[in-house]
Amino acid sequence: MKVLVIGNGGREHALAWKAAQSPLVDTVFVAPGNAGTALEPALQNVAIGVTDIPALLSFAQNEKIDLTIVGPEAPLVIGVVDAFRAAGLKIFGPTEGAAQLEGSKAFTKDFLARHQIPTAEYQNFTEIEPALAYLREKGAPIVIKADGLAAGKGVIVAMTLEEAEAAVHDMLAGNAFGDAGHRIVIEEFLDGEEASFIVMVDGEHVLPMATSQDHKRVGNGDTGPNTGGMGAYSPAPVVTDEVHQRTMERIIWPTVKGMAAEGNTYTGFLYAGLMIDKQGNPKVIEFNCRFGDPETQPIMLRMKSDLVDLCLAACDGKLDEKTSEWDERASLGVVIAAGGYPGSYSTGDEIHGLPLEEVADGKVFHAGTKLADDDRVLTSGGRVLCATALGHTVAEAQKRAYALMTDIRWDGSFSRNDIGWRAIEREQN
């Protein structure tokens, strides 16, 4: 069968790489893909942008694609799933209506409140003065979020009132996030440890994926501005069996049932960003309507199940007939980014020292890369690569991931040197 993966990031390289391992699959196309997918013998890039729905649809029809897997959020919130389904094609992802869970933070907070799903106390604002009055009433630390899609960067955790007021001005008056910031959500600062809880949903049934923990801040020790994610590991020890059960009962099931009851039946990957307090109670920080990036990379390295088989079952509403199998070992991925990220950075730099052959129990996934005409690999984004490895402990996986990147360099490249530190601290104590 033929599979199409939509996207060009590290997440899509990992999903396509995993899909190509399925015995059901003959060909995997990636639209538009990157240098990493271009260099994989089992994958084929197609030069179509992720939001060009008419072109994606006609390609899928002409090539008789049997299954499409959507990586990023942008095509989901503009209805790629609706368009493919209307044409009778199998596609795994949420409809435009269901993708509002990521597309609008205000929609999500109101939905959580309606269904009594645990989350931070909040209010939505479109005007500066009421927002500032609310800030002064609540005090800092406090969190300000742009309502729409801002590539994971539209969230300011303000530790002082001045910082909070500046963020409100930037978003509502200064247009810091364009259309995404015309409405903002101000919510209480939650203390605890974050985890990424990702499941597959077929509208009715849920199949949990392995847990993971992302590292959002650009600097070591979780300092500096938020990014799309500087590294991740799986499993996340903070999600104990008890926390897992609470998350399913209090958050995932009520969300799936609530969406169906409101006429937005949810299908696809559902990613709950959780904050887990000292008592092990999870609250929703955010929902994403797709797999996380960089969490996908370490999770796919651990996945023993056939991803394509699971996606097909989900498209047919038969996820209850499936289980997911995972490598017992931990995995960890470190993002190598372009100098200046998450601010402005240069592109078109040649990347040196990429591994020439596949390594056992490890993989360098490509994100912001492109292949030059002479087959040199060049940078084309802020997050460029993700070096990912398995290990019997998170510490061992960390050591192997950093070893994979020893020779990789380009002008200005950088990474955090402490990915996985929370889990490693736990292992040592």
Curated annotation (Swiss-Prot):
PROSITE patterns: ATP_GRASP, GARS. It catalyses: 5-phospho-beta-D-ribosylamine + glycine + ATP = N(1)-(5-phospho-beta-D-ribosyl)glycinamide + ADP + phosphate + H(+). Its EC number is 6.3.4.13. The keyword ATP-binding applies. Keywords: ATP-binding, Ligase, Magnesium, Manganese, Metal-binding, Nucleotide-binding, Purine biosynthesis. Transmembrane segments: none annotated. SUPFAM superfamilies: Glutathione synthetase ATP-binding domain-like, PreATP-grasp domain, Rudiment single hybrid motif. Residues 109-316 form the ATP-grasp domain. Mg(2+) binds at residues 286, 288. ATP binds at residues 135-196. Binds 1 Mg(2+) or Mn(2+) ion per subunit. Gene3D superfamilies: 3.40.50.20, ATP-grasp fold, A domain, ATP-grasp fold, B domain, Phosphoribosylglycinamide synthetase, C-terminal domain. Its cofactor is Mg(2+); Mn(2+). One of its GO terms (molecular function) is metal ion binding. Pathway: Purine metabolism; IMP biosynthesis via de novo pathway; N(1)-(5-phospho-D-ribosyl)glycinamide from 5-phospho-alpha-D-ribose 1-diphosphate: step 2/2. It is an enzyme of class 6 (ligase). Coiled coil: none annotated. GO terms for biological process: 'de novo' IMP biosynthetic process; purine nucleobase biosynthetic process. PANTHER family: PHOSPHORIBOSYLAMINE--GLYCINE LIGASE, PHOSPHORIBOSYLAMINE--GLYCINE LIGASE, CHLOROPLASTIC. Monomer. Belongs to the GARS family. This is Phosphoribosylamine--glycine ligase. It comes from Salmonella typhi. The lineage of its organism: Bacteria, Pseudomonadati, Pseudomonadota, Gammaproteobacteria, Enterobacterales.
